[in-house]
Amino acid sequence: CFLFQPIGLDAGLGTVINGELVQGNYHLAGEVKFLPMQLSDDKANLNKTPEGIVELVSKMLITISSIIAPEVFIIYSDMVDDVNVIKNKIEDVFASEVEDFNIEIYKVEHLQEYILAGLMLLCAK
């Protein structure tokens, strides 16, 4: 799963299963802004601080993990410095249920490379 969390805006999630992008009915797959979450503050306020972004991203990824349990998350967000903080929050939730639970999370620093690669793949189809 690839999570794009821009500053001050709603996140989006792209999920690839068996080599195919999941679009869902009405192309709603990945519209994580509709996830019901218990948050410490309004999403609009959380979306403006590094701590708030970590809370939002962690809770989104916990929800996604409980639904489809992806092997890997890839995150793009200018406000996330250390993905290990998010990784630890997710692992804490599942550790009591799943022995040796471990999730891989990577941070993308430069989004342009992935945009170009995605466009090239679309053109090749």
Protein language model annotation of sequence segments:
Residues C1-L39:
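Phosphate-binding/catalytic loop of phosphoryl-transfer enzymes
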